A protein has these predicted regions:
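Active-site neighborhoods and metal-handling regions in enzymes and metal-associated proteins
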Residues: 1-338
Length: 338
């Protein structure tokens, strides 16, 4: 945690800012190990501090690696900063406007992406936790025995979450998607109280020690479904094969998108090719046409091309990769489940 703070202090010095204000829960957790349950103000400066809510004080004192004080009011917090001679304040881009308003009359303020840039590059410890979350999620999927499961979509989703927790997850990393039949053409379908139809699409993930995993598998049954599955698998595999440091994220999106377009389904690929993950399930950067972030070693990003045929079915295949000299898939669950 100290290295995260030291790096941000260097950014502050370079840009002539005296302090950096964070309120997003996972940003506070990233800096201090303490994840708020109510609200918190984390101020990174020479002597960093967290102002925590009264109901969180026991938790904050237990978990935080930096000093914690009980939040009294905006005025008290602002007065303490001014007494330290702080006249300007960098803020995270996600800072709520209502919070910004409280500070703008007392400090020169500018939005800075220091924390986002820090979180793009995962430490070996972070990657280990993502890998463990993936291991838990994939084992739970296999324990589910989906091809012999006669439950409803809702029951299957519930069972998968239960299995992940039994296998060591703290919880699911997002609302588990179990969808089937024609509804599988909805990228964010909600599980229904209906028996599984064909094909079956499951998008799921676990959280382990705060870090998320994310996978998608589609089980196909007909020749037509297999045809679409093969196209998506080709796009998935080629995108992963081409990932390397120095390329732009948008170039990887184009690799996957070009394959799907070449088969005539370009307009049926209706989302980006992937997103980073870590403490949050969606982080930056991502494999999208609009993201020109340069790929670097230490990034962890999903690859999830899909084809969605309205009224028929959809196919999506997703794995998470860690990037060093090339991309390595995290986990060992086969793409084809049979």
């Amino acid at each position: 945690m100290e290295s995260h703070i030291d790096n941000i202090l260097k950014d502050l010095e370079k840009d002539n800012f005296q302090a950096y204000l964070l309120t997003q829960f996972t940003n506070v957790e990233y800096i201090s190990r303490y994840k708020p349950t109510s609200f918190a103000f984390c101020i990174i400066k020479e002597n960093p501090i967290i102002y925590a809510s009264g109901m969180d004080m026991e938790l904050a004192n237990r978990d935080s690696s930096i000093e914690v004080r009980k939040y009294e009011s905006y005025n008290v917090m602002i007065d303490e900063l001014k007494k330290e001679g702080i006249k300007n304040l960098a803020i995270e881009p996600s800072l709520p406007f209502s919070t910004y308003v409280k500070f703008r009359d007392d400090f020169e303020i500018d939005s800075k992406t220091y924390i986002d840039k820090q979180r793009m590059i995962k430490t070996p410890s972070e990657i280990e936790k993502i890998a463990k979350a993936t291991e838990i999620a994939q084992k739970s999927f296999l324990d589910l025995d989906i091809l012999n499961n006669s439950g409803t979509e809702k029951e299957v989703a519930f069972d998968l979450v239960r299995l992940m927790i039994e296998n060591g997850a703290s919880k699911e990393s997002f609302d588990t998607i179990v969808t089937s039949g024609a509804a599988s053409s909805l990228p964010h379908a909600i599980p229904e109280a209906k028996k599984l139809a064909q094909p079956i699409l499951i998008d799921w993930g676990a959280i382990y020690e705060g870090y998320c995993s994310d996978n998608t598998r589609t089980m196909v049954y007909t020749e037509r479904q297999q045809e679409i599955w093969d196209i998506v698998a080709e796009a998935h595999d080629k995108a992963i094969k081409d990932i390397k440091p120095g390329l732009k994220c948008c170039e990887i999106d184009k690799v996957a998108r070009d394959i799907i377009e070449d088969y005539g389904y370009g307009d049926k690929f209706i989302h980006s090719t992937g997103h980073s993950l870590g403490l949050d399930i969606h982080e930056t950067p991502g494999f999208s046409l609009r993201d020109d972030t340069i790929i670097e070693e230490g990034m962890v990003i999903t690859v999830e091309p899909g084809i969605y045929l309205e009224g028929e079915f959809g196919v999506r295949l997703e794995d998470t990769v860690s990037i060093s000299k090339r991309a390595s898939v995290i986990g060992d669950l086969p793409l084809m489940i049979d």
